Amino acid sequence: YHKTKDESSVGIVHLSDIHFNELIDIQSNKYDFNIASKRLFLLAERAKTYFHALGVTEILIAMTGDLMNSDRRLDEMLNAASNRTKATFLAVDILQQFILDLNKDFNITIAYVSGNESRVNPEIGWNDNIVSDSYDTMIFYILKKVFEKSKGIYFIEGDCSELTICINGVNILMMHGHGCINGSVEKSIEQVKGRYASHGVIIDYVIFGHIHSAI
């Protein structure tokens, strides 16, 4: 546990579309569990440098889906490092080390929503029982169990399709993005914010994945 220096300063680490278990080995691109682990280590190092410079002691790790790669198509099955059951525990181990690394310097809160590629069943559904049948959900709750006695590590449970979090008066919406982010990203986001505004909820910031691009 780390004493909070400035309650108004909260850092956000966004994890999305990691696609654990995907295996890529071509001249222009390579990806496997080892590379994923190295990338997360580098992300942790850069995050610590940035957050320390801003006096941050509290971090939100926002996981917005597709932590696990799909295996529904033949090319995905042929380009998998392992099966998804074994891959789940490898993913948990890598994320556990990532969280522990950051927790050396910061208090951490972890929240998640489910993606589309990491779902267990082939069909996409929007019912909570269907959406939560996901490797994203499984990884989140395994991590929650792993850290249940840890100090300075907290978990937020909620709607695994879209989750709103209020941080120091700022309403943040977490979502994966499939089904609503398409065409013009800016227009799609404004439509989502408008949907919430019609119910009296003003969204200040939207965190999402799915499109595999930084904007």
Q: Where are each of the predicted segments found?
A:
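Extended recognition/assembly regions associated with phosphoester-bond processing machinery
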Residues: Y1-I215
